[in-house]
Every structure is written in structure tokens, then in C-alpha cells.
Regions:
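Topology signature of small-to-medium multi-pass alpha-helical membrane proteins
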Residues: 1-142, 148-153
């Protein structure tokens, strides 16, 4: 029987959907103009699409990548926007659109996946002591490990 994803997971999925849609628009624009590098956006679409499917299925590895990759990419995006604005290489409107369309949704994904109901959905709450855990017992995160009681499930 499949579990229904809680609200924070749906928020993360919706935020990833915004990022995927914006990436698709940018990829189509660059492909249409004949610019090189449009395939990078296509790769990002595929990567985020796989991540989105994993989040909906309750895969722990997707939770791990979604939580931390989204945070790192959001920080990199904000730093890039700040650098572009400080060197006057970006207009404020473009930076605001990039922040609202990419960085903010990425931060929303990371925050939403850190909620207690998201931990429970991805079976990241220790059955022995009830402590939430974000540590995997193996490389692919098929089993989780509790920091507090060292239980593996």
C-alpha cells in the first residue's frame, strides 16, 4: 500500500516543478537561438525530474539529494547573482527573476524536506527511540542509522 505524501513533500515537489519549468523555458530559448550549452539545461531537467519522481515515491536517496543539493545549488545561485550584480553584469530585473524562479524554490525544497512529517514519510524516524535521522547506513541510503541509539532500520 502506497503512503500519501504529506504537505511538505508536495511543497518540495511543486517548488521543483517551478525550477524544472523555468529550466525548460531557458533550454528551449537557447536551443531556438542556436546558442551552445542548451543541453546543460536539458540535463538539469532530467536530473530534477528523476529527483521529483523519487520524492513522490518516498525514496530516501531522493530525500537526501533533494534536501542538500537544493540547498547547495540555492547558495551557489545567490552567490552568482550577487557577483553579477556587483560587477554590473546583470540587470536587477533579471536577478530578481532568477532568484524568484530558481533560488527561492530551491531553498523551499530544502526547508520543506526538513520538516518532521517529511522525515516520517521517508521513514527517517528511528523506530526505537523516535529520533529523526538523516544518516544512511549504506552508500545508497537503503537503510538509515540513528545517531542517538545506533539503531539501523
Amino acid at each position: 500500500m502506497r503512503r500519501r505524501p504529506p504537505t511538505p513533500v508536495w511543497i518540495a515537489v511543486a517548488a521543483l516543478g517551478v525550477v524544472i519549468a523555468l529550466q525548460a523555458v531557458v533550454a528551449l530559448y537557447f536551443a531556438r537561438v542556436g546558442s551552445l550549452g542548451w543541453w546543460r539545461f536539458g540535463f538539469a531537467i532530467v536530473l530534477f525530474g528523476v529527483l521529483l519522481a523519487g520524492l513522490l515515491r518516498g525514496v530516501r536517496l531522493a530525500w537526501l539529494w533533494g534536501r542538500y543539493l537544493a540547498l547547495v545549488l540555492g547558495v551557489v545561485m545567490v552567490a552568482s547573482l550577487a557577483a553579477g550584480l556587483s560587477r554590473h553584469e546583470l540587470r536587477w530585473e533579471v536577478a530578481a527573476l532568477a532568484f524568484a524562479g530558481v533560488a527561492a524554490p530551491l531553498f523551499a525544497v530544502s526547508i520543506a524536506l526538513g520538516r518532521p512529517t517529511a522525515f516520517a514519510f521517508f521513514d527517517l524516524v528511528c523506530p526505537n527511540c523516535g529520533h529523526p535521522s538523516s544518516f544512511g547506513a549504506d552508500f545508497l541510503f537503503r537503510k538509515a542509522r540513528c545517531r542517538r541509539c545506533r539503531n539501523t532500520w
